[in-house]
């Protein structure tokens, strides 16, 4: 199972965003005024300013996540979100040494449901690991031996995004039509944010959710799964209101 952890983020993120927003409106704004920004100031100004559509201020808060145990299929989708920073576990320098197929690869549930097919997958993956290790033992450097590894191999990656890019990411990847693995990662990222009292309010204020939450309707209405809107809104509201 993939593990997602919010490891770091901008100190006093909502106060930082509010302080940045007020530079345009507040005649008494100064560098020193940051220390005077209170929770009341945040609640008074931030929802209103975001309601005007002034979302560039969200870029002043950044969030760093650690993601462990997803496949390279997932990270190939993740890094398409270019306004972000990524550092991924290297297959060039780190040798894959797990013997357990389940610990080494992500196998979709659709494969596991077919017992015969599942056993064939595990057999091929075990042979892949064996040949990979044999290649290294025969003097092939891991940067070449890795060519045999499939996209299903588990990996680790650190992701840093600003809040505006996170909103864009969530809009696409929390959707029921997103690929299942990156959708799971996206929901866990949002859940990690919801655990923090100093972050949770922004989830609703900035509508950090799938596009049906952001727009108020599904932009892919003709392709929408039955009952999707109601199910997604209920799930999102539960996360947005959850506490650590």
UniProtKB/Swiss-Prot annotation:
Induction: RNA-binding protein that probably controls the regulation of its own mRNA.
Family matches, as SUPFAM superfamilies: Thymidylate synthase-complementing protein Thy1
Domain ThyX intervals: 2-207
Keyword vocabulary terms for this entry: FAD, Flavoprotein, Methyltransferase, NADP, Nucleotide biosynthesis, RNA-binding, Transferase
Gene3D superfamilies associated with the record: 3.30.1360.170
GO BP terms, alphabetized: dTMP biosynthetic process; dTTP biosynthetic process; methylation
Motif (ThyX motif): 80-90
Cofactor note: Binds 4 FAD per tetramer. Each FAD binding site is formed by three monomers.
Named cofactor requirement(s): FAD
InterPro entries on file: Thymidylate_synthase_ThyX, Thymidylate_synthase_ThyX_sf
Family in the record: Belongs to the thymidylate synthase ThyX family.
The protein's assembly and partners: Homotetramer.
Name the record gives this protein: Flavin-dependent thymidylate synthase
Gene source species: Pyrococcus furiosus (strain ATCC 43587 / DSM 3638 / JCM 8422 / Vc1)
């Amino acid at each position: 199972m993939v593990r997602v952890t919010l490891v770091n983020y901008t100190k006093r993120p909502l106060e930082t965003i509010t302080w940045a927003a007020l530079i345009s409106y507040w005649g008494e704004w100064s560098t020193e005024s940051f220390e005077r920004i209170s929770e009341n100031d945040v609640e008074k100004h931030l929802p209103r300013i975001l309601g005007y559509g002034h979302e560039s201020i969200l870029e002043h808060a950044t969030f760093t996540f650690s993601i462990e145990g997803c496949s390279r299929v997932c990270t190939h989708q993740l890094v398409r979100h270019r306004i972000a920073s990524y550092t991924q576990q290297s297959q060039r320098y780190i040798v894959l040494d797990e013997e357990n197929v389940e610990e080494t690869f992500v196998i979709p549930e659709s494969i596991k449901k077919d017992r015969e097919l599942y056993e064939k997958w595990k057999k091929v993956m075990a042979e892949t690991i064996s040949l990979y290790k044999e290649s290294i033992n025969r003097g092939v450097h891991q940067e070449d031996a890795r060519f045999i590894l499939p996209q299903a191999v588990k990996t680790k990656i650190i992701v840093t995004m600003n809040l505006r890019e996170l909103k864009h990411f969530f809009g696409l990847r929390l959707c029921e039509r997103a690929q299942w693995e990156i959708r799971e990662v996206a929901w866990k990222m949002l859940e990690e944010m919801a655990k923090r009292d100093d972050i949770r309010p922004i989830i609703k204020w900035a509508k950090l959710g799938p596009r049906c939450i952001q727009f108020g309707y599904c932009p892919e209405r003709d392709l929408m799964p039955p009952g999707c809107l109601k199910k997604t809104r209920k799930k999102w509201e539960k996360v947005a209101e959850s506490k650590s």
